[in-house]
Amino acid sequence: LPQGAPSFDQAAFIQSAAEKTGLPTVDLLGALTEHAGEPIYYRTDHHWTTCGAFYGANALLTALGKEPLKETDFTPEIASTDFNGTLYSTSGIHWLAPDTIEYWVSEDDLRVTSWKSGKEEPGRLYDRSYLEHKDKYSSFLGGNQPLCVLENLSLIHI
């Protein structure tokens, strides 16, 4: 934001909302702030990058008492090097170089169920057809939808 632009304390707002609900929370703000120098958000979009989602997932796992993931568990695949997100489209910051979209998770042994049309149907973790269009971010899960369930079929339940 420009110097002197009105703003509000997002951390205080999040803390206040958490206290009012009394529900358990996950400190995503702290997890992302720890990695502020890394590409956790797209420069041209409001979404987390896959790297940001990795740190968010680890914050959730830690809050649940589970072992965090390691970056070495993944082999990132570059899906697109020409992603221009909604900030690019709406702000006039067209001098920024496009972002890169990475896929970190293999679709092997993963079942995705979508309710995109309002009824249960098979889904996909990555819908690569979106990579040929402007809305490349929708390549994740086929875009926004009311509900999507991912099941790891190779996970052993004890």
Which residue ranges define each predicted feature?
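Acidic helix-start/capping segments at beta-turn-to-alpha-helix junctions
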Residues: 1, 33, 76-80
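Membrane-embedded segments
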Residues: 1-21, 41-43, 48-52
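Short, conserved phosphate-binding/catalytic loop or strand-edge motifs used
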Residues: 31-38
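Histidine-centered active-site loop/cap adjacent to the catalytic His
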Residues: 42-71
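Secreted/periplasmic serine-hydrolase-like ester/acetyl group-modifying domain
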Residues: 63-154
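Conserved small/polar residues in nucleotide/adenosyl-binding loops
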Residues: 156-158
